[in-house]
Amino acid sequence: GGAMLWMTAFHFCFDLSHLGYWPQDFRADPVWTGQRTAIVSLFLFCAGLGQAVALQQGQGWARFGRRWAQIAGCALLVSAGSWFMFPHSFIYFGVLHGMAVMLLLARGSAGWGRWLWLAGGVALLLPWGAQWALSGPLADWAVYFNARWLNWLGLVSRKPYTEDYVPLLPWLGVLWW
């Protein structure tokens, strides 16, 4: 419940700024970027816990599929709505898009047991290694990984210009842990 209240307050402040009532730099100010990171982390960590509990209680694929379809459908609505509001920075892989993909991967990797701790650690660290490599020795590859068709993986040398960006990596690591 606390994450929902925090997200609501955050978005209220974002809306005030977007409408010009309270100018803030939500893209660069550490006060806002830190809160965004914490809120997304809480949501994904709780989603991972929820998946673990659901599997422990024997949740079948049919129920999972219905819940997943709701999340994926809402992600599509977010993309459509943001395209009208922010045509140059619409949301094509935000928190709901990421959660839809991550929930499928979490469901498929549920039998990994303790290996999920290692996989989660790798998922958390891999983007930093990719950023270093794509900014240095593998810079020629950056154009591909930074493109929209691959940047949803999170292996980028620079973040894309979009209103919300929650790539698969490192966030899958948060959901797995």
Name each region found by the language model.
Residues 1-177:
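Alpha-helical transmembrane segments and their immediate juxtamembrane cytosolic regions
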